[in-house]
Amino acid sequence: MNIVILLLILTFSIKHSNTYKLKNTYIPINYMYHNNKNILRSQKSKLFLNFLSNNQLANSNKQTCFFKSNIKSSISNIDNYDYIRKRYINTSNKNKLFYNITLRTNDGEKKIECNEDEYILDASERQNVELPYSCRGGSCSTCAAKLVEGEVDNDDQSYLDEEQIKKKYILLCTCYPKSDCVIETHKEDELHDM
């Protein structure tokens, strides 16, 4: 029943979506990301992506779904994996890996826990730590921060250039932790003064 509802929602949600060529027809694929609060953002999205990858997508070396706010997730039925980063969506907390993040904010140090598949900005909001943001898609500098210690995956962003990345600037709205981290927040002005 839930899959049928999801398919109906997808069929009727044709507004401003990126499209995919599915067996010689184009259909929109809207934002799908896990969150137990609503069906479009539930784990059912993962089931639908598997359905698309196994049954509907035209043959190609690379198929990537682009969702709202530039969030991307790769579909698993692909011949060439060299350029693909997979995101597995799972709402279960069993054996879930998380990292301790120390945020050096304008109001002092804040410590949060961030799941390995969760953006640092989302984790901070979940734990009532307010940080600046605008686009939530890695295409502006409002949530700019600087990585002091640790390692992150900031590949989902599209704003920072190579020089800024080498100087350890990150965008918290599209940044996954890969280890425990220390991060200085509120770095938008510093970023633009470079």
From Swiss-Prot:
Its cofactor is [2Fe-2S] cluster. Residues 99-189 form the 2Fe-2S ferredoxin-type domain. Residues 1-19 form a transit peptide. InterPro entries: 2Fe-2S_ferredoxin-like_sf, 2Fe-2S_ferredoxin-type, 2Fe2S_fd_BS, Beta-grasp_dom_sf, Fd_pln. Pfam families: Fer2. Keywords: 2Fe-2S, Apicoplast, Electron transport, Iron, Iron-sulfur, Metal-binding, Plastid, Transit peptide, Transport. [2Fe-2S] cluster binds at residues 135, 140, 143, 173. Binds 1 2Fe-2S cluster. GO terms for molecular function: 2 iron, 2 sulfur cluster binding; electron transfer activity; metal ion binding. It is found in: Plastid, Apicoplast. GO terms for cellular component: apicoplast. One of its GO terms (biological process) is electron transport chain. Ferredoxins are iron-sulfur proteins that transfer electrons in a wide variety of metabolic reactions. By transferring electrons to 4-hydroxy-3-methylbut-2-enyl diphosphate reductase LytB/IspH, plays a role in the terminal step of the DOXP/MEP pathway for isoprenoid precursor biosynthesis. Belongs to the 2Fe2S plant-type ferredoxin family. This is Ferredoxin, apicoplast. The lineage of its organism: Eukaryota, Sar, Alveolata, Apicomplexa, Aconoidasida.
